[in-house]
Every structure is written in structure tokens, then in C-alpha cells.
UniProtKB/Swiss-Prot annotation:
Species whose genome carries this gene: Citrifermentans bemidjiense (strain ATCC BAA-1014 / DSM 16622 / JCM 12645 / Bem)
Protein name: Probable transaldolase
Any one cellular-component term (Gene Ontology): cytoplasm
Gene3D superfamilies: Aldolase class I
The protein's role, per its UniProt record: Transaldolase is important for the balance of metabolites in the pentose-phosphate pathway.
PANTHER family assigned: FRUCTOSE-6-PHOSPHATE ALDOLASE 1-RELATED (PTHR10683:SF40), TRANSALDOLASE (PTHR10683)
Cystine residue pairs: none
Subcellular location: Cytoplasm
Amino acid sequence: MKFFIDTADVKEIREANELGLVDGVTTNPSLIAKSGRRFEEVIKEITGIVDGPISAEVISLEHDGMIAEATELAKIHPNIVIKLPMTPEGLKATKTLYKRGIKTNVTLIFTPMQALLAAKAGATYVSPFVGRLDDISQNGMGIIQEIRTIFDNYGMDAEIIVASIRNPIHVLDSALIGADVCTIPYSVMLQLAKHPLTDAGIKKFLEDWEKVPK
């Protein structure tokens, strides 16, 4: 399973990349706003750090505007993936960009049927949001299993990016189900590496080492 980092914080991206954990990056308008920097400036810097897919989201809500934005974004770097909303206009734009050979990531997916529609329109990636479903007492990971089954049944090419990851269990469940990608906040990436018994073991080794005659 591939790990994308879900952030527009260049410092976090550099640190995660140094750990060997980053196969790609997902950004969105909210994450860019948190950075306090110009959109294009941030995206360009990220492409210089990570050699993998970089999802950059359009702001327009209608087809022609989406295509105009996508065309400009795609010029930034060959690794740019255009992030589009799961709407009828977004699906139309997905189909248009597919025909032009531009990769897409259809986002804000909350049902298996939305994922299937996006895949049929030619999406490179589909991004179901598990944490937000959990927030309203729905089974976020359940739809990942359903999407995986549907895509396998029909040989769909689109890759499943599990998004809105809140904790390490989301990542574990995604791996067990067979999702293609998890896009993970840096804080959760760090949690994946931690265990109290690891810390206790290191402490014990160091304590024992102090007893070795010098």
C-alpha cells in the first residue's frame, strides 16, 4: 500500500519524505490556506521534494472553469494530479481530462456508487473520506471494503485513496482491505511508528548498557 501525506506544510512533507514514507501528496484549499502562502508557490515547492503524484484541487464548480484551472495546474509539473469534486460537473471534467491524458483524483466521495461513477468517468484515483463518515456515526471503513469489492468485480483501473484518516487503525484497516493508497496527516504517520513496548525496550537496552564494564 502506498502512503501519501495529506498536508500543504512543506516542513512536514520534507520530514516525512526523509523517513521514506511518502509516495505522494494530497492538498486541498483548506490545507493551502493554513500554509499562508500562494497556491502555485506551494505546489511548485512540493514537486521539488516528492517524486510522486501531487494532488492539486480546482476551485471552480462548473466544467469549463475546472478544465481551465486543470490545464494551468497540469503545466506546473508532470506529477500533478487534478483534484475534482464528486459532482455531475466534476464527473464531466473528469471525462474531459481523461481524454486529454491528464490524471485526476475525484474527492469528497462518501458512497460506493459515487466511487463507481468516478471510476467510470475515467478517474485515476477516487478519494472516499472515512473519518468524516465516522463523525456522523456511519461506517467509514465499510465503504472502503465495498468499493474494493466493486472495483475488483469489474476490473476498474481507478486506485482507491483512503482519505480523512484520523488514526492508525484507519491505516491498518485500509491495508487489510486492500486499499491502494492511504493519504495520512503527518501526526498520524508518526503515531504509526510508536509503541510503548518499543520505548520500554530501548530504555532497558540503554540501562543494561550502562552496566557493561567500560
